[in-house]
Amino acid sequence: MSRPTIWSFGHLVIWSLIGLLTSGCLHRPTANPNVLVVGVTSGPNNLDPRIGTDDVSGKTAQLIFNNLMTLDERLRVSPDLAERLDNPDPLTYVVTLKRGVSFHDGHELTSADVVYTFRSLLDPAFVSPRKGAFRMLNAIEARDRYTVVFSLNEPFGSFPVNLVIPIVPDGAGPSFRDHPIGTGPYRFVSYATDDRIELARFDDYFGGRPQNDGLILRIVPDDIMRGLELRKGTMDIVVNDLAPDIVYQLGHDPDLQLVKAPGVDYQYIGVNLRDPILQNKLVRQAIASAIDRDAIIEHLRRGLAIHATGILPPVSWAFSPAVAEFKYDPARARELLDQAGYRDSDGDGPAPRLHLSLKMSNIEFNRLQASVIQENLRTVGIALDVRTYEFATLYADVLKGNFQLFTLQWVGVSDPDMLRRVFHSKQMPPNGFNRGYYENPEVDRLIDAAMAAATDEDRRRLYGEAQRLLAEDAPYISLWYKTNVAVSRTQIEGVKLTPSAEFTFLRDVTKH
């Protein structure tokens, strides 16, 4: 199958089906025209924000709760429920709370709620995936009704980002997941399993009354059906939950509109540096030079991505542009393979220079991307065996180091501490996410120094140097950062996407 056929076949089939379905029956829109219907892919795993960290649980929590701190447009930590954050010494952080903030049941937010939230996360009997983020926390105490003191075991410059966490009321127990109560712009009404989550406007929200009466998060697992409901007007908006081909087609519908913004989701090819072939940096650089990212972004991703140079996105305050960028250059890739000792033994003949295998999930869109990468590598002499798996099987193999290459994505990269978690030599499994077994003492030194640095300026300088070394070493083959995109009816106003595509903007959205 030729490249143009591969890139066009999917959306032709999809939209032929939609054409057939447009006369069918759908859920009727809400009776209240000032309630927004938002399309999501699945139900939440858990509405207790200390436990539920899947995408839909997280987005629902953004509407019901507030974080102690939040992230601004440059992914810097800034106050949310906090009035301010002070750091009088390297081991102490003092949070002063805003006054007059009400929970949905009417009681005022105090330091007791904050202390309870964090102590519950540290409680060995409380099972939470967030627990590991607070290993450096020695104690948390309420100094008074509106002041909380966090004491650390050791200096940790990224600690403030760990305060970007929803605050629950003091005493929230096991049943809290069934009727969550927060301080956010919307209060929980109901959850119909695998159908919808209903939220009502909270008129006493400290950040100002929401511009709409409420939200219905409609659970529609299928991309085609979400696109269809948008076209029919039974859904008002979908954010980042439509395939690029569907977004492209919906963009030509006069009743719909697109809003795009830079995102922080990072797609990459992971590399096993214990593999004798891939230990050679020149081979990794050759792979990076052989991939035609621009063609994949233009044709498969429909322009909804930008070329990535590393795990930190350009919107991050710590991002450094002064790093090596591997642009599509097959000739350079062949030269690098020559230098690595993998010479072309038969000129333009069929014999490959070397064989590698790539593991990936069995999602059809990923298969299409892999087929292009496979062809790119073939042209420079690398025979790539693409193997697809159910996600659970793929992930288990990655955790065990059972791979040469794999492709996954990091979602919501927001803090430069990701460099430590993914590339520091002390973060190899089971301690962290250094699943490719990368080891560079200078990168370790720079990351350690950044963690202990007193100012963001020092941290940015140190992280910038680490990014330069990582780009050259290529322990990951960077592919792209996804672009955030919201598709909505033209009656919808006020859509403003953040880098992490939080649902918080929905409080300012109106429908006319």
Label each region the model flagged.
Residues 28, 340-413:
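Ligand/substrate-recognition segments at binding pockets and active sites
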Residues 40-89, 119, 181-182, 500:
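N-terminal lobe/hinge region of extracytoplasmic solute-binding protein
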Residues 76, 155-156, 161-214, 222-225, ...:
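Gly/Pro-rich hinge or "lid" segments in bacterial periplasmic/extracellular proteins
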Residues 86, 96, 129-171:
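Surface-exposed binding/hinge segments that line
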Residues 174, 202-248, 374-375, 383-385, ...:
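Ligand-site clamp/hinge motif
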Residues 201, 252, 278-375, 439, ...:
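Append "and occasionally in soluble cytosolic enzymes with long acidic Gly/Pro-rich linkers
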Residues 486-512:
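Long beta-strand-rich cores associated with HINT superfamily self-processing modules
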